């Protein structure tokens, strides 16, 4: 789908100050390096400032300070990246699904599907499920018994919702995501693992986004819960009984063990792992590949592990780490000897 808007229209949408011709046609968005004369770009990161003067973009979203001295067309805004985020949807070429149920879809007789919803080819909607207004269910999706998908939801092809999953409004779920799979619960009987039925469900709030191949397990007794506005990247594992607070964001490959609770407005970078049964307070940032082994009670930034270094240096550091315990013992012995020498009856300035 091709979209064209004028600079004047974009300025009105954003409440921006326009420097340039209102009638200039904008057909899309691109980076400063790649944008052409009918495309809009933006400068949000100072490290890309070097590309601004030579950009061929038809116009650029800029802060007032960056717009000073720039000869090209500009839309001056307080936050160029946020402005870009807002107008990106105007130029999104994603196909719009048409309302209706595809003939190949299998829909239970007692399932409730709003007339404005779109149900794609070979989708399955089981007994008691409810699909809200303007929901789009992609091809080959599975919606289990008694699931609820709130209005405006968008499920890409091959999303799986097991039974008793409740999805809020305007939720986006990407392909391969599995919501409501059985949690990893077993009891050990003399070395043999006995399965524990996972009889809870999953409850997901409004405006949540769930990435490709992410798994959210159902609760053992009560629901696993994802708060409003949570953003989950690809290949994240959320175990049974986990609770995630509103507007928390997680990058790819985060793994959260069972019954851990994460607060609101937290950010977990890629590859972070959390053990089970801990609490993370609000407004916490955890850097990539950190292993969180205990509760965090104070807002702030946290890290673990070692940063990248040349291989030879890393090998030396690793070798030293193996000897830390022995070195600590030797240091304690040395401190005792120093104390003995310095306090062994020698004269002092007061003696």
Swiss-Prot record:
It comes from Pseudomonas putida (strain ATCC 700007 / DSM 6899 / JCM 31910 / BCRC 17059 / LMG 24140 / F1). Pfam families: Hexapep, LpxD. Homotrimer. InterPro entries: Hexapep, Hexapep_transf_CS, LpxD, Trimer_LpxA-like_sf, UDP_GlcNAc_AcTrfase_non-rep. GO terms for cellular component: membrane. The gene is lpxD. Keywords: Acyltransferase, Lipid A biosynthesis, Lipid biosynthesis, Lipid metabolism, Repeat, Transferase. CDD domains: LbH_LpxD. This is UDP-3-O-acylglucosamine N-acyltransferase.
């Amino acid at each position: 789908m091709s979209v064209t808007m004028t600079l004047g229209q974009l300025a009105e949408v954003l409440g921006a100050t326009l420097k340039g011709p209102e009638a200039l046609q904008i057909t899309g968005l691109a980076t400063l390096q790649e944008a052409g004369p009918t495309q809009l770009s933006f400068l949000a990161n100072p490290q890309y400032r070097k590309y601004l003067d030579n950009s061929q973009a038809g116009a650029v979203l800029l802060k007032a300070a960056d717009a000073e001295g720039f000869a090209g067309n500009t839309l001056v805004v307080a936050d160029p990246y946020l402005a870009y985020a807002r107008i990106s949807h105007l130029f999104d070429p994603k196909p719009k699904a048409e309302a209706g149920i595809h003939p190949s879809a299998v829909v239970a007789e007692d399932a409730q599907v709003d007339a404005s919803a779109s149900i794609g080819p070979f989708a399955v909607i089981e007994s008691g499920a409810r699909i809200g207004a303007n929901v789009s269910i992609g091809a080959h999706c599975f919606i289990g018994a008694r699931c609820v998908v709130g209005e405006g939801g968008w499920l890409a092809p091959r999303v799986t919702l097991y039974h008793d999953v409740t999805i809020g409004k305007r939720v986006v779920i990407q392909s391969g995501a599995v919501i409501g799979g059985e949690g990893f619960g077993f009891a050990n009987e003399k070395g043999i693992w006995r399965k524990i039925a996972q009889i809870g469900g999953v409850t997901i709030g409004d405006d949540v986004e769930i990435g490709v191949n992410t798994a959210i397990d159902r609760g053992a007794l009560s629901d696993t819960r994802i708060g409003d506005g949570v953003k989950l990247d690809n290949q994240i594992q959320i175990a049974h009984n986990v609770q995630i607070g509103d507007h928390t964001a997680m990058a790819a490959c985060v793994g959260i063990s069972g019954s851990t609770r994460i607060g609101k407005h937290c950010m977990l970078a890629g590859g972070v792992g959390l053990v089970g049964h801990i609490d993370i307070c609000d407004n916490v940032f955890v850097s990539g590949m950190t292993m969180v082994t205990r509760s965090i009670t104070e807002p702030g930034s946290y890290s673990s592990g070692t940063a990248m270094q040349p291989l030879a240096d890393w090998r030396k550091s690793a070798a030293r780490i193996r000897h830390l315990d022995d070195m600590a013992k030797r240091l304690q012995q040395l401190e005792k000897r120093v104390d003995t020498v310095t306090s062994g009856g020698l004269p002092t300035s007061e003696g």
